[in-house]
Amino acid sequence: MPKPVILCIDDQREVLAALIKDLDPLAEWFDIVDAESAEDAGAVLDDMIDRGVPVALIVSDHVMPGVTGVQFLTQIRERGDLPHTRKLLLTGLATHDDTIRAINEAAVDRYIAKPWHADQLLDVVGRLITGYVLEVYPDSYQQFLPVLNRDVMVERMQQGPGPHGDR
């Protein structure tokens, strides 16, 4: 089974480098992949889907040339071929309308303002990937235990089987 992927998208190479560095503690369990535009990210996702590579999380900047992060994440939701993939939006320049669209149209799971703190990013990502892992790998989640968020796991155990709002 290929490792699930965390796809990071930002048009600024230094921001991508910081994201990859901050997410490095997860690299034993997840492949961290980057793209510098929504167009590149779309091609990466198409390739992963064709190869059967699971995509756990998309971390996208909002303000990018061409297609914004909200527009891209809306396209991902509308595609329908990544139903379990979690979505995290990063931005320092979102308007109130952007935030509403991110929630209502793109079904973004979380939002983090730039600049972020590494521990904040890892906490949010940990919560999102825990929900993903418990949903997609219910019988083999133990292999991910070192990086799963314990609070989310306890909440899930208390809720019992069935659909959950852990996003």
PLM features: what roles do these ranges have?
Residues 4, 13-37:
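Two-component/phosphorelay signaling modules centered on CheY-like receiver
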Residues 9-10, 61, 91:
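Active-site residues of response regulator receiver
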Residues 34-47, 69:
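Helix N-cap/capping motif at the beta->alpha junctions
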Residues 49-59:
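Active-site beta3 strand of CheY-like receiver
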Residues 64-65:
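Receiver (REC) domain active-site loop signature in two-component systems and cognate sites
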Residues 71, 94-110:
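Alpha4 helix (beta4-alpha4-beta5 surface) of REC/receiver domains from two-component response regulators
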Residues 115-125, 129:
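C-terminal output helix
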Residues 130-167:
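CheY-like receiver
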